[in-house]
Amino acid sequence: DLSVITVNYNGFHDTCEFIDSWAATVFSVSYEMIVIDSGSTANEAALLQKTYPFIQAVRSERNLGFAGGNNLGINLAKGKYLFLLNNDVCMVKDAIPLLIKRLLSSDKIAGVSPLIRDYAEPHAIQFAGYTQLSPITLRNRAIGKGKINKDHYPAQKTPYLHGAAMLLKKTIIDKLSLMPEEYFLYYEELDWCTYINREGYELWYDPA
């Protein structure tokens, strides 16, 4: 049901830590894991495939960027749900059923991002939803960033998902579009989320 997609660029050890944390934490759903090795200096796809036979490691000889790497993974994905995760993320609990429950709570919901905590300070929040972009500064902020996690940030709609962790309905992405690749790195998920919103769909943050 679930296609987990992550992009690796000269990040073998981070990617291994991510895969190890996922395999040790997530048991609630069947999944495929697609790792896109996007132009790493060495062929890290081959190393990852040898280390983790259960994944599908795909090598791109050139660096496709954040959007291009994820789009390659989306095109290969067979699951009903896409979970795009940065390769420096570490899973700490199996919240997948709760995130899928949120995703399925309305036909209008296209995607959901979970609570994200700081790697160096696990009690500190990195993301609990986003504010809108300011029309004056064209900047926004992550709700709760730097605060101690005390369950003060309930589920709510968010204008943008967090690029480090985005769970999406594949049917909607197939209907709309892949992630825009013009940016190469940064802002592509904001543009993508803005487009998804304009097409009448909702995006949610869920603490799961």
Indicate residue ranges for each PLM-predicted region:
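Short aromatic/hydrophobic "clamp" motif used to bind/position activated sugar donors
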Residues: 82
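Catalytic donor-sugar/metal-binding loop of nucleotide-sugar-dependent glycosyltransferases
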Residues: 172-185, 190-208
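A conserved acidic beta->alpha catalytic loop
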Residues: 12, 21, 37-46, 62
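Short beta-strand/loop segment that forms part of the nucleotide-sugar
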Residues: 30-39, 58-60
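Short, acidic, metal-binding catalytic loop of nucleotide-sugar glycosyltransferases
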Residues: 20-30
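Acidic/His-rich active-site region of diverse nucleotide-sugar glycosyltransferases
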Residues: 98-177, 182, 190
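Glycine-rich, basic loop-to-helix element that forms the pyrophosphate-binding segment
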Residues: 59-77, 87
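Acidic donor-binding/catalytic loop of UDP-sugar-dependent glycosyltransferases
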Residues: 43, 89-102
